[in-house]
C-alpha cells in the first residue's frame, strides 16, 4: 500500500511539474519546450536581468561627488540641457563635485528629443575632453545623449551607425569597456537611469531609432525625489504616460521563450528579450503606482508623496521594460514625434515643434491594446482592473475593449489631447506614419500579435480621435 501511495504521489508531482499554471498571473507561455516554438522556429530558452545600481532618497544627489571620488575619477563630464543648467539639480551636482575636489566640464547643449546631429555634437565634446567619468543630470534625452557620448568616446574609431539598431544601423554588439556614468533623473518617465538604451531621431530618414546594449547602462542611478518638485504639471503627465506604457507593453510583450532567434552567443541576446517572470513583477508594481499616484502628481505640484512615488515607478518600469522590452505603442510613437508639424506641447521650453515622447506613446494605447488582447487576454484584463475597470462580469473576449475604455477614461481625466488629429495629423498622414513604424522591428516584433501594414494603418486611423 505504501509503495502504491508513493507511486501515485510521484506521478502527481511529475504531472504538476509538466503542466503550466492557468491562473491569470502565470498563464503566460514560460513553460513551453525550451528552444522550440510551436511553429518549429528556434526560440530563446533564457533571459537575463541587467540593471544599473539604484540609490533612492531625498537629497541623495549631494553624494555624487563622493561616488566619483570613490571611483577614482579625476576629469568628469557633466551633461545637462540649457533649461536645467541654472536650476537646483545641476547646482547641487556641481557643488558636490567641487566639494570633493573633482575637476569637471559642463556640456549643456543636450537637445530635448535628441537627433543624430545632437548626439554627434555631444560625442565630439566627449572625445576632446578625454573624460574618465560622466554625470547626466536631466530627463531621458540627457541620459541617452550621455550614454552615446560615453560609448563613442570609448570607441573612437567606430562609425556612428556601427552601434545603431538594425535595420537603420549595423547593430554591432558593444565590446569596448566604457567609463563610469552616473545618471541623475529629473523627470519621472523614461527610466533611462536603469536601461542600456539610447533613443534619437535619425534626421535623414525622419524616424526614431537608437542604440540598445546592456554595456551602455549607467553605472549608478541617483533617484532623488526632490528633483520632481520643479516639474511643470504637463511634463509630469507626459512623463507618467511613458511609465504607464512601459509597464503595459512589457507585461503584454511576447514571452522570452517565444522570441526568436535563439542567440548563438550570450553577447547577442538583445536587451529587449520579451516578458519574463522578473520583469513582470516590476511592470505590475509600476502600473499600480501609476494608477494610484499619477493624477495626484499632476494636479498638485506640492504632493511630494505622489511625485516621489512616480519617480520610483519610473525606475521600476525601467527595470521591467529595460529587460523585457516594449512593443507597438512605442514603435508607433517614433514617427508620431518624428514627423511633427507645428504642434508645441504646453509647458515645454523649446524653440521647435515638439510632441513629447510620453504623449506620442499613450495616444495609440487604446487602439493598440484592443488589437493585442487576442493574445494573453487575461493579462489585458488584469491591467484594466489595476487601472480601475470593473472586470467581474467581463468576458475574456472583451479584454481589449475593457482595457481600452479604462485607458480612455484615465487620459480624459487628465485632459489629454483628443487623439492624433489634435496634434495636427490626418488620414493623409497615415502612410507616412506606417512607413516610419516599419523600421522599428526591434520593438514591434515583441508585440504579442503580429501586424501587417494594413493593421498598422488601421491602428493609426483608430488613434486619430480618442473620445
From Swiss-Prot:
Gene3D superfamilies: 3.40.50.1970, Dehydroquinate synthase-like - alpha domain. Disulfide bonds: none annotated. Its main location: mitochondrion. GO terms for cellular component: mitochondrion. Its EC number is 1.1.99.24. It is found in: Mitochondrion. The modification N6-acetyllysine is found at residue 445. It catalyses: (S)-3-hydroxybutanoate + 2-oxoglutarate = (R)-2-hydroxyglutarate + acetoacetate; 4-hydroxybutanoate + 2-oxoglutarate = (R)-2-hydroxyglutarate + succinate semialdehyde. It comes from the Eukaryota. GO terms for molecular function: alcohol dehydrogenase (NAD+) activity; hydroxyacid-oxoacid transhydrogenase activity; metal ion binding. Keywords: Acetylation, Lipid metabolism, Mitochondrion, Oxidoreductase, Phosphoprotein, Transit peptide. The modification Phosphoserine is found at residue 452. It is an enzyme of class 1 (oxidoreductase). Catalyzes the cofactor-independent reversible oxidation of gamma-hydroxybutyrate (GHB) to succinic semialdehyde (SSA) coupled to reduction of 2-ketoglutarate (2-KG) to D-2-hydroxyglutarate (D-2-HG). L-3-hydroxybutyrate (L-3-OHB) is also a substrate for HOT when using 2-KG as hydrogen acceptor, resulting in the formation of D-2-HG. Belongs to the iron-containing alcohol dehydrogenase family. Hydroxyacid-oxoacid transhydrogenase subfamily. This is Hydroxyacid-oxoacid transhydrogenase, mitochondrial. It comes from Rattus norvegicus. The lineage of its organism: Eukaryota, Metazoa, Chordata, Craniata, Vertebrata.
Amino acid at each position: 500500500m505504501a509503495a502504491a501511495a508513493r507511486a501515485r504521489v510521484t506521478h502527481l508531482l511529475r504531472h504538476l511539474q509538466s503542466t503550466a499554471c492557468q491562473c491569470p498571473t502565470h498563464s503566460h507561455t514560460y513553460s513551453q519546450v525550451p528552444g522550440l516554438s510551436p511553429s518549429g522556429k528556434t526560440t530563446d530558452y533564457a533571459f537575463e536581468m541587467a540593471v544599473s545600481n539604484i540609490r533612492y532618497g531625498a537629497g541623495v544627489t549631494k553624494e555624487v561627488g563622493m561616488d566619483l571620488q570613490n571611483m577614482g575619477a579625476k576629469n568628469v563630464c557633466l551633461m545637462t540641457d540649457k533649461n536645467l543648467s541654472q536650476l537646483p539639480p545641476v547646482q547641487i551636482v556641481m557643488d558636490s563635485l567641487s566639494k570633493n575636489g573633482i575637476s569637471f566640464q559642463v556640456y549643456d547643449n543636450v537637445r530635448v528629443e535628441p537627433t543624430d546631429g545632437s548626439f554627434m555634437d555631444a560625442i565630439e565634446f566627449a572625445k576632446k575632453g578625454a573624460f574618465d567619468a560622466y554625470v547626466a543630470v536631466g530627463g531621458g534625452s540627457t541620459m541617452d545623449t550621455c550614454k552615446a557620448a560615453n560609448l563613442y568616446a570609448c570607441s573612437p574609431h567606430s562609425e556612428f551607425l556601427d552601434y545603431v539598431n538594425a535595420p537603420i544601423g549595423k547593430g554591432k554588439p558593444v565590446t569596448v569597456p566604457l567609463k563610469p556614468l552616473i545618471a541623475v533623473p529629473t523627470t519621472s518617465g523614461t527610466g533611462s537611469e536603469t536601461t542600456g538604451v539610447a533613443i534619437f531621431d535619425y534626421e535623414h530618414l525622419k524616424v526614431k531609432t537608437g542604440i540598445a546594449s546592456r554595456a551602455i547602462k549607467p553605472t549608478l542611478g541617483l533617484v532623488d525625489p526632490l528633483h520632481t518638485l520643479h516639474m511643470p504639471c504637463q511634463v509630469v503627465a507626459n512623463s507618467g504616460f511613458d511609465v504607464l506604457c512601459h509597464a503595459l507593453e512589457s507585461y503584454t510583450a511576447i514571452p522570452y521563450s517565444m522570441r526568436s532567434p535563439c542567440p548563438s552567443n550570450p553577447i547577442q541576446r538583445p536587451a529587449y528579450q520579451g516578458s519574463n517572470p522578473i520583469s513582470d513583477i516590476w511592470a505590475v508594481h509600476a502600473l499600480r503606482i501609476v494608477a494610484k499616484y499619477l493624477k495626484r502628481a499632476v494636479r498638485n505640484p506640492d504632493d511630494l508623496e505622489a511625485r516621489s512615488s512616480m519617480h520610483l515607478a519610473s525606475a521600476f518600469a525601467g527595470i521591467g521594460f529595460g529587460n523585457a522590452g516594449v512593443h507597438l505603442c512605442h514603435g508607433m510613437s517614433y514617427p508620431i514625434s518624428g514627423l511633427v508639424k507645428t504642434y508645441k506641447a504646453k509647458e515645454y521650453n523649446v524653440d521647435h515643434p515638439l510632441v513629447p515622447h510620453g504623449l506620442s506613446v499613450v495616444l495609440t494605447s487604446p487602439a493598440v491594446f484592443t488589437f493585442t488582447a487576442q493574445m494573453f487576454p487575461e493579462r489585458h484584463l488584469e491591467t484594466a482592473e489595476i487601472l480601475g475597470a470593473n472586470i467581474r462580469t467581463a468576458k475574456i473576449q472583451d479584454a481589449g475593449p475593457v482595457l481600452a475604455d479604462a485607458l480612455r477614461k484615465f487620459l480624459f481625466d487628465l485632459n489629454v489631447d483628443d487623439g492624433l488629429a489634435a496634434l495636427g495629423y490626418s488620414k493623409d498622414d497615415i502612410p507616412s506614419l506606417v512607413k516610419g513604424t516599419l523600421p522599428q522591428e526591434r520593438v514591434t516584433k515583441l508585440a504579442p500579435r503580429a501586424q501587417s501594414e494594413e493593421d498598422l494603418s488601421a491602428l493609426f486611423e483608430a488613434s486619430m480621435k480618442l473620445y
